[in-house]
Amino acid sequence: MRAAVGLMLSHGAGGMEPALSRPDYEQSALHHSCLLVLLRGVGPSRARVLQRAFEKVRRVNHIRVNDSSGHPRSIWIRFVHDHPVEHNDWGDFQTHRRLLGLVTIGKFDSQIELNELCRQHESLKVRYGSTLYESRAIFFGPDEQPLETIGEVLGPPAAGGRRLQDEFTTPSNFKAQAFFYREQDSCADLESRIGDFASALFWVLESRRLERSREKADKVSLLLAPFEKRDFVGLDMESRNNRKRCVGRVMKNLADLSLQAGLVDDALSLYHNANETLRSVGDSLWVGATEEGLCAASAMLLYPQMRETETLHRNSSLQEAGTSPLKNTPEKWRASDATKKISASDATANNVDSNQPQQRVTSNSSSCSSVSSLVTTATNSSASDTPTTSSSSTSTISAAPIPGHQRNGDLPGNILKAEEISNYYRKAIINYSKYRHAATIETEAALKASRICIEQNRPLDVAMFLQNILYINLSMSEAERVKRFEVITDLYQQIGYQRKAAFFQRLAALKHVQQGSQAPDWNQSYRLMLGSFTGYRLCLDPLEVIENAAGWPALQIDLVQTLITAARRLGHSALATRHMTFLLQTQWDNMSPTEQSEMAVQLQNLSAQCEGSPVPLVLENGTVIPPANLTDLPYCIDLQVKDLPAHLRPQRIKVAKADSGPFLFTPIHFNSVDRRDKKKDKNKIAFQWVQNDLSEVTVRLRNPLPFELPVTDMRLLTNGVVFESLPQTLVLQPHVPTYVALHGTPIETGQLDLQGYSTHTLGVKSNCRLKHMRGRSFPPNYVVDVIPALPRISVKTSLPQTATFSNMNSADIVVTSASLTLYNGESSSCTITITNESATLPLEHLEFSINSNVEQELQQKIFRIDEEAIKAHLPVPPQGTIEIIVDVFAEADFVCPQPPASLHSAAAPGDYGASSLTHYSSVSTSGHASLPSRVGSPHHRRNEPQNSSFRSTISGGPPSLAALTLHPGGGGGVGPSSLGSQYNQHIEAQVRFKYSGGDALTAGYCRQCAVSFNLELLPSVQITSWDVLPAEVASQFYLVLDISNLTAQEMSLNYTDTKNILIEAKESCRVPIPVDRCSLEKVVAARAAEVAENLERELCFRTQLLSFNDALSKLCSIHIAERVKIKWLLTGTDIQGIASLRGIVLSQSMVDLTAVSPLEWAISFQDTLVQPHNEIVCTVGQRSLLSIQLANQSLQPLRNLVLSIKFYQDYLNGMENYNLETRVAISGPNRIAIPLLEKQEQKEHTCSVIFFTPGRFKASIECTSNPQKQSEQPSSLLTRSCPAEAESVGQSVMFSSSYDEQQAHVWKFIPPIEVTVVEQ
């Protein structure tokens, strides 16, 4: 743009020619219409006192004034804090550069100070006297004395009051108008007075404009720029061209005055005319001025929003909430209605009634907090909505809406269009470029054009104008060059050219500290470099830099290193450490391993002077530097939240739920609710921690540096409840993963957020949070519920511990163990001592449970604990103890099971199948099912001589038994060497305790621990064979047992209340035990239970029915086990126990002898009722009458009965003689068939007996029942297709048939009748 033009109209001899001393970088096109007023503080700086006054004055930057003809004018005021005097010389060239007003503000406490303030004000008037129209002085004096104000408070204030100007007087040479206020005065009328001051400036300006407009064209003088005075010396000013030059320049000057006086339309016309006139004579400098004036006047109408409140000068560290310089690109395309307003036929704007007698004063929201800041900070005019009212004797000051919004008609036809403004600015700049003394004006024009193009959304034009500024050759100081770069930076930022803005900002920073500078300003350099972060896609928060990962790493690293150097030169070691930490945190992945190592060492050296901490740093100018953390140094590979040890983990106390109503099921899935719940509990840990209990988090770390990395004071980072974290110190080897356990104690209850950990490495304290760790699938945090404190206990037992703990489930809760060895049937006890180790919590809840590797039923027989005794000792106070006694009984199966071979060898009618035996099977000590086997039938054993002699011995009188050795297979039984129950058995069990107390008990939490029991059971005694024999009385029977001593010691066996026997080690003996027979009531109850269960099975369509014989056999087995207890004692020791007959298997003949017969016998011999053991005597040849009466005392009828009578002689040596045809004769049948014997029915049979020889005879009277032969089984009638009919048929069969129809039974009259026959 800047063409090389050879012709220079501005040349001259030596000497410094007048020029603008410096550009006004804050100028905009709209400032052409403003009245320039100097606002200056005088006297000592009292920022807190005068700040309010400065704000009030600066608010009045726009007024509405009615001119002499009644038309409203919009007058704008521009307050500046400083104005070079030589700029007034350019007032003819551009009138807005002329200072027209002066306002000073000062504070005094005495007359001397007031005089000094007046003197300073007058000196300013003299300095700018050539252009100054009006001036005002605002003085703040001391407050009234307290004693003087008491009267005013107590009474009404005086009409006039004591005025400050009455106490203090201004010097006589002070001619300016002064306003006096007390220090605490609210200055309510100050804005109104400043409005009057602005109005006065307007009228003076208006008079000058009118004077200029009335000048005759032939009498006007030539207006000159300061450097042009020598160019026109000796020229003929009456020439045609010079006359046109004079008229054109005056016309341009009048246009400037009209623009300031609010006559924008007139100014446009004048600028156009002046431009044509001056262009015709080749007056390039002033042609450029008219073109710039046209642009300014058009911009006032097109872009009134440029007068609105400008952006506050915010502190660079205070970013807007929720925004980030890396996330939001500065607004490049701002909305503008400029082009719309040109083409629109009617403008739609917010109109304000101009007849309202109010004055709109606009506020300037400045960030200045002191008078001194006003001296160093440029002032900008802006709009506000604070209205005040004022009156004037010469004009009416009305409400002043923002001009351009009050548009009653279309825009003027001669206004420049939007695209023409930038073209006219180009022309103006080209014209200015022809004059080297106009370089400052050229620079300002380029800046104004840039701001207009920003409003027009023309970033390329903005960049072109700004680039042209760099080529303008200006003689300026380094400070001015820095200022120029800063302004260019700001404009580039407004159009979104962040990198260009950052380049110039960094260039300005380097200018402050360039080589050769006598006073390098590192503070300003640091500030500017910090401000250039945005352009390089950096921000002060390292987390956002890492998250966005934008920009150019090489440039970013270089910038941060330069910033570190500046911080070091400032002597701010903490700041240098912070930036070096920032560099390592954000650029770690962009560095080579060598650079990483070098930077780490450099950080270590910097932190040696001042260690880094994870807290924000606040600089002197208010900039906040966020904390930087070495999140990946060391590198966290994994982090796991550990549960408490198993015996300390909290568990819920199970409470039986009350029935709250019917259970409702729906297949509908509420997906949104499910997703919300999953998202909510995504980071929730499944277990809980306990208040005041040490908790653990395991971290796996890796050192990425090539040297050892010491890490000290490593702690957990938490949020939520109070958590006391314990420090950890370690040294990490290079590139070696290392596990670290971090511990801490929650002090309160509630939710605990585990956010990460803190480290102290390389001299920097860092908070390493999980959410900031990149490249790992860590959640933002872990949420752990902390429940109330639980008591802790220690457990000891009175038994020795085992070498190894239990292998059962939940073995991790075992805290101690106990081992015990018992013989089968032996009892013992174990005392468990529980100590409450809590310092404050009582043990209020204690419950136990036992788990073992045996079935529950057997377990309950082995282990017993008195629960009521435990409850009686609760609660246990802190440091108190409670003793729990565990009774242990070595439960075992003492009845020897029969091998499978004997199951098939038994041919008795009462043989059982495997299915029937399962109904009363027992469990062995090893935990596996052991089905008791049925022994051989007694009928077979009776044929053996040994058994025969044994029975005879029992029936003959008290037995004389001797110990006998049992061999495998001998005696019809099974030898001890083949018994599986003779081997040692091992039982593992756990006694588990759940305990709680305090608030945790109320919340429903407890702990669980266990004691492991290792119980070894040794074989003691075993029942190898058994039989049932009739006793001397009908109400009893003899249970004959073969008992083996499986121990290695002699054993004393107590098998009745009064009878004992000694058994040698590994020997056996046979003992008879009298037992009461099972009552008929129990048999009847068993029959009823069997019928009910079979009926239930039929209703449930079960085909397998129960057999009454099985139920009766089981009943008899249980009857024997309940009544027979064999006590044993190992001689010479205190080891003793009890052997039970649980699981004994009985054949059908044994069952008939065990249970009470369903027949009631009444036998008479010679009309005398036979009683047991009664002696019956008769003579040889005498006919004796034998009467037998049977009664069915069962609840079922009996069928197919056969009553038989046999006489025999017992030789008492095991031999019985039934061949007595020559010795006894029976008159009548000795076998009588009874087809049916109903319940409670009686049958009687009578016969006569004649004995032919004397002797002792016995009569065997028995009744047998034979199984009923049926073509079709009753069960076959019960079909699934017809359950109702099957039920009725089944019931009829069950209740109509007797239980003897399925088995053969033999019921004898016990004992046999003994008859002694004597000679006559």
From Swiss-Prot:
The keyword Transcription does not apply. Residues 362-400 have a biased composition (Low complexity). Signal peptide: none annotated. The keyword Cytoplasm applies. It is found in: Cytoplasm; Golgi apparatus. Disruption phenotype: Failure of both actomyosin ring constriction and furrow ingression in male meiotic cells. May be part of the multisubunit TRAPP (transport protein particle) complex. This is Protein brunelleschi. It comes from Drosophila melanogaster (Fruit fly). The gene is brun.
